[in-house]
Each structure stands twice: as C-alpha cells, then as structure tokens.
Amino acid sequence: MQLLDLEHLGRERVIGSYLLTGDEPALVDCGPASCLPALRSGLAAVDLDVGHLRHLVLTHIHLDHAGAAGLLVRENPALLVHVSEIGAPHLVDPGRLERSARRLYGVEFDRLWGPLLPVPEENVRVVGERVLGLEAFPTPGHASHHLSYLTSDGSCLSGDAAGVRIPPARYVAPVSPPPDIDVEAWERSLDAIAKRRPDRLCLPHFGVVDDPEDHLERCRSALRTWAERARSGSEAEFVRAAEEEIQAAADAETAGVFQQAGPLSQSYAGLRRYWDKREETAAA
C-alpha cells in the first residue's frame, strides 16, 4: 500500500489517497477533480496511470475524498467504484451533493474541487462486509454513510472517522462539516475501530499513524471538547480556541494545512447543526 499526496491547491499533506497494488490496482479514495494532476503524477511514479486502475474504494462521498470519481470512470470505463449503500445514489446523481457543497463553499467551489461528474450506475458496487480482501465496516459520525476498511496486515483505512492529524504534529482535529454530524455515532465508530486493534491508521489527512490507540483517544477527547464548545459558545469562540490548540501543537505551515484540510468555521457549523437537530427532536 502506498500513500499518494494529492497536493491540494499545490500544498502537501492536505489530502491523500492510498494505492493498493497487485493484479488489480485500486485506490482508496481519489480526492477531488482539482487534484487529478497530482494523482496522475503519483501513479506515474510507480509506472501506473488511470487506465491501469481496476477499483476505487470510497470511505465516503465528500468531495475531498470522492469528487474525481466520475472523471476517473469517464477516462477508464472499466473502473469499478465501491461505496456504501447510502452513498451510491449520490455518485450516480451528484446533483444534490453538488448543490449542498456549492451552498457551503460559494464562489470557491470550482477552484477547490473542480467539476463533479456522475458515475454510471453500471460502474457502482455497493460494499458488503468485504471488498478486495478488506474488511469493510460502518463508521458513521463524520458522515452517516462513512465506511472504514481493515487490511489483513492490520492497517485501518479510516477515512475521516479517526479525524485529521497533520505530521509531525500530534494534535487530532475531529473535522465535522455539515450536514449530518452525529457525535454519539462517531464515538461508537471510534470504538469499532479500536475493537479491531489495528497496528496503524491510514489517514487521508494525512498519512500513516503508528500509535492508533493513543490517536483514537485523542480524537475522542477532541470531539467531546469541540462538541461542547459548539453547544455553549459562539463561532468566533470555537474557532479561536481550536486555532490556539493547533498553533500550540504545530508550526505555522502545518497549522495552515490543518485549516485547509478542515476549515474550523465549517466544523462549528456542523456541530451546531447537530445540537440544533437534537433540540428540535427533544421539543417535538
């Protein structure tokens, strides 16, 4: 397995994709269309191109993980895209996903992510308990349709379920954009990962973590802290507190990568929406 740095907007350590080599090369998450030049370069470095890929395995359909899927299939019609049952319809018809993302990112959408193309239904495969020799298991919380994957050698491809950690910093940011953050489900997902006792975590943001037990507890602690701050404080207070923590743990460039991988204002919005939905449910 090899990590490909997708160099989002020309910056390293923001978004990564994992290449599974073998008779049928596969990517776990592909990043957005805006990162396709770096993806091509990463594949070329190991004597591959998009046409060699046979499978794309998705943790979830957020644009920084799956935005290029439609373009890749257009270029390579033999490519099979493996995704959760909930996520599959949004690949086939990404209109709702794109409208939601354009509301969130506004005029920056195209620069950040590039075009979002549909994946033909015949190229989509709904993930069961196993795919390509990987154990697939649900890890909702960051997204309701989120999946993680465990390899036979103990690597957990955890998507965003295990948060964001930009090396060399040890800080873990539970990035939590709208629309369907669920803190309780997320904690159960951390339990599900820990129960499998992985030897390492493979993070799209960013890289391989060799202390998974400590990392997962850091993620859980930060999630609880961030959730409480969003419940009781303003956006400005939330952002300021998280910025101070990140800046204390990272150099200036790495702190900037944290922000690019998961803007803090969006995490506030996602967690605030979570609390608002809970209050609406309680009042009903």
Predicted segments with their positions:
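Metal-dependent catalytic neighborhoods of phosphoester/phosphodiester hydrolases
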Residues: G67-N76
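Histidine/acidic-residue-rich catalytic or RNA/ligand-binding cores of hydrolases
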Residues: D211-S221
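A short, structured active-site edge motif that brings together acidic residues
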Residues: H55, H82-P94
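Conserved beta-strand hairpin/beta-sheet module of binuclear metal-dependent hydrolase folds
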Residues: M1-V46, V50-H52, Y149-D160
